[in-house]
Amino acid sequence: GTQRKGSGVIIDDNHILTIGYIVVEAENINITLSDGKKIPGELAGYDSTTGFGILKTAIPLKLDALEFGDSDKLTKEEMLFIIPHLNEGKPSAANMVSRRPFVGWWEYFLDKPIYTFPMNHSWAGAPLINQYGKILGIGSLYVTEAYVEGMLSPGNLFIPINDLKPIFDDLIQNGRRTKDIKPYMGLSSQINSGKISVTRVNENGPAAKAGIMEKDIILSINNKKIKDMEDFYKTVWSSGGPGSKLNFE
């Protein structure tokens, strides 16, 4: 649609942390505070590798900000809280039930995302906080199998806050990461009968220019056989930065 909305969390006097897909490519950004006050904002930084987005407010917020926690130390025993904007949904308690990898068909991979249960319906951009009010993650997705693959357990996926820390200054100062940039292929894919099947090729992208087409099957890269989606992405990303040439079979 033409409009998107979601939640975010104040991290300093002029910045709000959210999920990038809510705000990326937006022509206008309007921020509604918890008291109903509306202020204009702009996209200060976006990282397609993790999915984080940071907004800059037009005026200082002069409100309490939340601090970053340590998502690497999160345990399944901790009580967590999902806090969406009050106009978007209700806060809810949750538990971390898994830290397994997540692979997205849109050239996206998270090594240790936080899967929570039960589900909060207003997850997009909502902070996941611990009992001390520290941010541990930002809401990204609804998932049907939070506990383990193959077990129906509707929950949410949060991007760990520790994934933001190495690139935070870059996003604030430069609007994007300037180090460890992953190459972009310009295709969507999925596992089909144990093989990587191309489901879409973006017009004028690197894959299209290389002659890759929808419904192609990718067997190997640089003579290395590909076993699954995770292996596919990691092989591409470890073969060189943007501009590197790869041999696809």
Regions found by a protein language model. Give the residues of each.
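A short glycine-leucine-enriched loop at secondary-structure breakpoints
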Residues: S7, G69-K73, A126-P127, P206-I217, ...
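Short beta->alpha transition motifs characteristic of CBS
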Residues: D12, T18-V24, P84, V97-R100, ...
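Conserved PDZ fold ligand-binding element
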Residues: D13-L17, Y132-L136, A207-E230
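PDZ-domain C-terminal substructure recognizer with occasional recognition of PDZ-binding tails
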Residues: K37-K38, E42, D169-R176, A210-M213, ...
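C-terminal cap/linker of serine protease catalytic domains
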Residues: L63, I82, G89, P113, ...
